[in-house]
Amino acid sequence: YIPRKIMSFKEFMDNFTKGMQQMITSGCILMLAWTIGGVCRDLLSTPVFVKTFIETTGLPGALLPALVFILAAFLSFSTGTSWGTFGILIPIIIPVAQSICPELLLSSLAATLAGSVFGDHCSPISDTTILSSAGAGVNHLTHVSTQMIYALTVAGCSLIGYLIIGITNGNLLLSLGTSIFILCIFCLLYTSDAADDMQ
């Protein structure tokens, strides 16, 4: 900016200082989030807990995709990372699914990915959430709470889909169709409520 004479050196330094002041809060939140995620992952032995929980529940195989979705969401929300949850759960889920119900292996892997991304999206300690709120210039917790409504709606529809795919032993069309149908009902209810509020 200075060589092209878009701004003077004083303007550049003033803007640089203002920009750094805006990023200090985000940087501190990000460092604390990484610390909390590391504590959950390493000191609290969350991966060991998840593996033991899956192997010892004794639940029927039909509930495996839904259970994996919930566990992935919980783990990702707790640690603030979807990729870390992939790395923790995928090596655990593959042998567990093959031993309990091999037909649901792909559904269980899909549930792992979807639950991890959902948990990461809703987590207040996720780096993507922190940087998104900082980039948009909004309060961090306000950003989390406004995103939660939409994410929980889609997660609820997905959970129903994973229950159906487990019960029907892998019927993808019925599961996907039911999830989309329920999501459409939510959208219709929401738009009708919004239209009533505007009148």
Feature names for model-found ranges:
Residues E11-Q22, V48-T56, I130, T142-S145:
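Short amphipathic alpha-helical coupling elements at transmembrane boundaries
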